[in-house]
Regions:
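Hydrophobic core of alpha-helical transmembrane segments in multi-pass integral membrane proteins
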Residues: 7-20, 97-106, 288-299
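Polar-ligand-bearing catalytic/cofactor-coordination segments
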Residues: 18, 22-35, 90, 94, ...
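Pan-zinc metallopeptidase signature
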Residues: 264-315
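Select subsegments of transmembrane alpha-helices in polytopic membrane proteins
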Residues: 40-48, 285-292
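Hydrophobic alpha-helical transmembrane segments and immediately flanking/interface helices
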Residues: 71-85, 160-178, 314
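Interfacial/capping segments of alpha-helical transmembrane domains
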Residues: 57-70, 304-315
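Membrane-anchoring/interfacial helices and their immediately flanking loops
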Residues: 1-44
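Transmembrane alpha-helices and immediately adjacent membrane-cytoplasm interface residues
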Residues: 48-62, 72-121
Length: 315
């Protein structure tokens, strides 16, 4: 089996299996950073494996076989059996179709990311123009009755809080919520979410992208919760999340404190996992990340090693 075939098999396998296994490992939210890393490892290696496979198919159709295919050439020379024109034509058709699909997906992904960037930058600029500053509140305040607090990437970034949220939160709760939003911006969570959501929009039938985008959004909220708890009491953050829960969606591209997986987050804030569960979950996620990183390399190495052994024997 060629390296391209191994990578193609890897991409298909991970795209099918990861959406079934990773949610089980990340459901508890015990180690959200590792959960995000596992999803990113699955998504990134799947995309890279698919791209390399397509490039390899195109290269084979355009420039012919490389030296690592010496075994097949040897068999053909000995047996007198060569590739039929029909097989060569089929390879060319597959290469053209794969290349066209990859190009189309790349263009759509780029357009989606550019559109998301325009929307968030425009909203950040508009919020700074329309909103106002209040002493003691490290955010732009909008005069709106809805309870909302969110961050928007831009130049510069903006943290937005509504008058309704100010009325619903006391000062310690507000500080904890704003620390949560700053954690999102410091960790570049909005940009990461834009990429995974753009992938999901580009290929909505590929479950690793759609399931990954939803779970990464949930886990990033937990990451921001953990960061905020380093400087604020967990109960203050918990009360702030509950006060903002169910207030409605935030603008496109924004990341809000009380809009994603509030019940799951409230549960982990109120009842943290014990040490044994933390160690177990981290070990499971660490093993998953290592496996996702090692498998494509191992598949490629085995495929190349098998052919190189044959080449060595021939020489």
């Amino acid at each position: 089996m060629s390296a391209a075939a191994c990578l193609a098999a890897y991409a298909v396998t991970v795209a099918v299996v990861a959406p079934r296994i990773l949610p089980r490992l990340t459901r508890s939210g015990i180690a959200p950073r590792l959960g995000v890393a596992a999803w990113l490892a699955a998504i990134t290696t799947t995309v890279l494996a698919a791209v390399v496979t397509v490039v390899a198919v195109i290269a084979e159709a355009v420039v012919g076989r490389s030296i690592v295919d010496a075994c097949e050439h040897l068999v053909q020379a000995v047996s007198g059996v060569h590739s039929a024109p029909a097989a060569q034509f089929a390879t060319t058709v597959v290469a053209l179709a794969a290349g066209g699909t990859l190009t189309f997906a790349g263009v759509q992904l780029t357009r989606n990311l550019a559109a998301r960037r325009r929307v968030t930058f425009h909203h950040a600029r508009s919020a700074r123009m329309v909103g106002r500053r209040i002493a003691g509140v490290d955010a732009v305040v909008l005069d709106a009755p809805e309870r909302a607090a969110y961050c928007v990437p831009g130049r510069p970034h903006a943290i937005v809080v509504t008058r309704g949220a100010l009325d619903a939160l006391d000062h310690p709760q507000l500080d904890a919520v704003l620390a949560h939003e700053r954690a999102h911006l410091d960790g570049r969570h909005p940009q990461l979410l834009a990429v995974v959501r753009a992938l999901a929009d580009t290929a909505p039938r590929v479950s690793i992208f759609t399931a990954g985008a939803a779970d990464v959004a949930r886990l990033l909220e937990m990451c921001a919760d953990d960061q905020a708890m380093r400087t604020h009491e967990p109960r203050m953050l918990l009360h702030g999340l509950v006060a903002l829960a169910g207030a409605g969606p935030v603008p496109d591209g924004a990341v809000g404190a009380g809009n994603v997986a509030v019940l799951d987050r409230a549960g982990r804030l109120a009842s943290p996992a014990d040490r044994a569960d933390r160690l177990r979950n981290r070990a499971q996620l660490g093993a998953a990340i290592a496996l996702l990183a090692a498998l494509p390399l191992a598949a490629t190495a085995l495929a190349l090693a098998g052919r190189m052994l044959c080449i060595t024997a021939v020489l």
